[in-house]
Every structure is written in C-alpha cells, then in structure tokens.
UniProtKB/Swiss-Prot annotation:
<comment type="similarity">
    <text>Belongs to the universal ribosomal protein uL22 family.</text>
</comment>
<dbReference type="InterPro" id="IPR005721">
    <property type="entry name" value="Ribosomal_uL22_euk/arc"/>
</dbReference>
<dbReference type="GO" id="GO:0009506">
    <property type="term" value="C:plasmodesma"/>
</dbReference>
<dbReference type="GO" id="GO:0022625">
    <property type="term" value="C:cytosolic large ribosomal subunit"/>
</dbReference>
<protein>
    <recommendedName>
        <fullName>Large ribosomal subunit protein uL22y</fullName>
    </recommendedName>
</protein>
<dbReference type="InterPro" id="IPR001063">
    <property type="entry name" value="Ribosomal_uL22"/>
</dbReference>
<dbReference type="GO" id="GO:0006412">
    <property type="term" value="P:translation"/>
</dbReference>
<dbReference type="GO" id="GO:0022626">
    <property type="term" value="C:cytosolic ribosome"/>
</dbReference>
<dbReference type="GO" id="GO:0003729">
    <property type="term" value="F:mRNA binding"/>
</dbReference>
<keyword id="KW-0687">Ribonucleoprotein</keyword>
<dbReference type="GO" id="GO:0005739">
    <property type="term" value="C:mitochondrion"/>
</dbReference>
<dbReference type="GO" id="GO:0005773">
    <property type="term" value="C:vacuole"/>
</dbReference>
<feature type="compositionally biased region" description="Basic and acidic residues">
    <location>
        <begin position="153"/>
        <end position="163"/>
    </location>
</feature>
<keyword id="KW-0689">Ribosomal protein</keyword>
<dbReference type="InterPro" id="IPR018260">
    <property type="entry name" value="Ribosomal_uL22_CS"/>
</dbReference>
<dbReference type="GO" id="GO:0005730">
    <property type="term" value="C:nucleolus"/>
</dbReference>
<dbReference type="Pfam" id="PF00237">
    <property type="entry name" value="Ribosomal_L22"/>
</dbReference>
Amino acid sequence: MVKYSQEPDNQTKSCKARGSDLRVHFKNTRETAHAIRKLPLIKAKRYLEDVIAHKQAIPFTRFCRGVGRTAQAKNRHSNGQGRWPAKSAQFVLDLLKNAESNAEVKGLDVDALFISHIQVNQAAKQRRRTYRAHGRINPYMSNPCHIELILSEKEEPVKKEPETQLAAKSKKSAA
C-alpha cells in the first residue's frame, strides 16, 4: 500500500490513482496538474485532449522563464505565457482515466466527480552521458516525476431554512 500525501475527507465518495517514476518532464507536468486542479473530471479530460490537439494551452506560472506567450493562455491566471506539453497531458489523462475506472468499480457517480487533489513530485534523476570534444563527457539527465490524484464526488450543500420562518422567529423574540 502506497502512502498518499493527503487522504480524502470521505473515503467512500472518492477514488485515487498514482503513477511513480514516470518518464515525463517534471516542470511541464507540474504546470499541467496545476491547470486542471479542482476541475470536474469531464472538463479536465476535455481540456487535456484539447491541449494534445493544440486547441488550448497550459498556462505556465512557476516554471515560465523563456516560455513564449500565446493568446490561448491569456485570462487563465497567467500573463499569456503558455505551452502545449502533449506528453505530460497524455500521462495525466491516462491517470484520470485510471481513476475514473476505479470510481466505476467503487460504484461512484462519474458525472459528479471532480479533482480534489493532484500533486506532482520530483523522482530520482536518471543519468545518461553525452560525449563532447577533446574526450570529455557531460551528464545527460532526465527529470522524471511521481503523480498522485484524488477524485471526489461533489457533496450536496445543506439546505438553508426559508427566510420567512427565520424572520417570524426573530419578531417573536423581539416582542
């Protein structure tokens, strides 16, 4: 049993999925995860499919030095800097589909699910080498990552009492 950094509030109304040591760039995956945080499952899947098709961009907010600007990233809590990290989007989309099938097995309502928690952590770097002039060797590192996510059902808010009854009670206490 693997440990998640956060446990869901209601275990019966949520499901989890996790990927470890995924060979995909950490920085791109972090921005992708940040873009779909708190979205409903259906919207998140559609958004990631649009990113893969280059119809919508992922706004880059933290790891954005040298990232070009695009109109697709405007008005998404960024100054217009964005990219289309297709490989990261595909990995996160596969995890969302895995979590969705876990929800179906649990008997949850798939249409009511939203991403309550998604987190990307750095994994151990993988080392390769590249050969340079004059017999030198430089490192050629990759930056894989771990991804974990939790889908939860939207909880129905408690119904508020009608105002007419509240007003009647307050008048009686004042008189």
